[in-house]
Curated annotation (Swiss-Prot):
This is Homoserine O-acetyltransferase. InterPro entries: Class_I_gatase-like, HST_MetA, MetA_family. One of its GO terms (cellular component) is cytoplasm. Its main location: cytoplasm. Pfam families: HTS (PF04204). It comes from Synechococcus elongatus (strain ATCC 33912 / PCC 7942 / FACHB-805) (Anacystis nidulans R2). It is found in: Cytoplasm. Belongs to the MetA family. One of its GO terms (biological process) is L-methionine biosynthetic process from homoserine via O-succinyl-L-homoserine and cystathionine. Pathway: Amino-acid biosynthesis; L-methionine biosynthesis via de novo pathway; O-acetyl-L-homoserine from L-homoserine: step 1/1. Keywords: Acyltransferase, Amino-acid biosynthesis, Cytoplasm, Methionine biosynthesis, Transferase. The active site is at C142, H235, E237. The record marks E111 as: Important for acyl-CoA specificity. It is an enzyme of class 2 (transferase).
Length: 299
């Protein structure tokens, strides 16, 4: 089924070129289908890239989804064309009276800051509180997962000695959740984090389940079944070249950055990386949309 996105959103042109089925919002209004309503709080500076990655995985399912994109009002993004935000994004105040089937909160490059030092922390916690009643199921990604975990459960992030960066093997720890239905026992996931959450602190919370983790990279996927909240600490939705762009960006800035592990063929950054995580990414997002967003609606 198609994903419904604004007619002129750059992501639509990219996905159409990949033969991904998209539908403009004007066309969608002419059909008699109730699409799942998913709101995405995009905190990334690379907004077009991130919205495209999320739209891509949500489009490749049997369920029709309409995306609503929002950005923070308390912090004005500086890396995105203001016209893009005006044309395709709303603020929280503009959508707070609506009900949504799903909420996705992205990561953000603010991992090493204390929570209260994040310009939009108060606004984010307001959105998280709003989601308790206004959203059926939530998916939090990377820093977004750490922020939601701290807000809802008081679990703090811990700073790593060095950035955890590369493509790491992960394994299923708990197969009871429909979120991991059909997953392989072991799978690869792109990781790009300066911080982590400690497993022992998660296990102390009876309502949280650790579904997948890595002996090298730590926790990957948590689930709060009762509250329909999914915490995803890594980036299965990443493109083939995302880690490459992050690596070259940090090198150009003179930041301390190691070669992403298990990513470039022969660890040679002059070679083109090969995607080995796409099927896991698609299955995870499909399961979330089906079992956490759609099926509770149909009961």
């Amino acid at each position: 089924m198609p994903i419904i996105i604004p007619q002129d959103l750059p992501a639509r042109r990219i996905l159409d070129a990949e033969s991904v089925f998209t539908l403009g919002d004007a066309d969608a209004r002419r059909q008699d289908i109730r699409a799942l309503q998913v709101v995405v709080l995009n905190l990334m500076p690379t907004k077009v890239t991130t919205e495209t990655q999320i739209a891509r995985v949500l489009a490749n399912t049997p369920l029709q989804v309409e995306l609503t994109l929002i950005h923070t009002a308390s912090y004005q993004p500086t890396h995105t064309d203001p016209e893009h935000l005006r044309n395709f994004y709303s603020t929280f105040d503009q959508i707070r009276d609506r009900q949504f089937d799903g909420l996705i909160v992205t990561g953000a490059p603010v991992e090493t800051l204390p929570w209260l030092a994040v310009d939009y922390w108060s606004e984010l916690t307001t959105i998280l509180d709003w989601s308790r009643e206004a959203v059926r199921s939530s998916l939090f990604i990377c820093w977004g997962a750490q922020a939601a975990l701290q807000h809802f459960h008081g679990i703090e992030k811990q700073t790593l000695p060095a950035k955890r960066f590369g493509v790491f093997w992960h394994h299923l720890r708990d197969r009871s959740s429909p979120l991991v239905r059909g997953h392989d026992d072991d799978f690869l996931v792109p990781v790009s984090r300066h911080t982590e959450v400690i497993a022992a602190e998660v296990l102390a919370q009876s309502q949280l389940q650790i579904l997948a983790e890595s002996s090298e990279a730590g926790l990957h996927l948590l689930w709060d079944a009762d509250q329909h909240r999914t915490y995803l600490f890594n980036h299965p939705e990443y493109d083939a070249d995302t880690l490459d762009r992050e690596y070259r960006r940090d090198r150009e800035k003179g930041l301390p950055i190691q070669l992403p592990l298990n990513y470039y063929p022969n660890d040679d950054p002059n070679q083109v990386p090969r995607v080995r995580w796409r099927s896991h990414a698609q299955l995870l997002y499909t399961n979330w949309l089906n079992y956490e967003v759609y099926q509770p609606l149909s009961r």
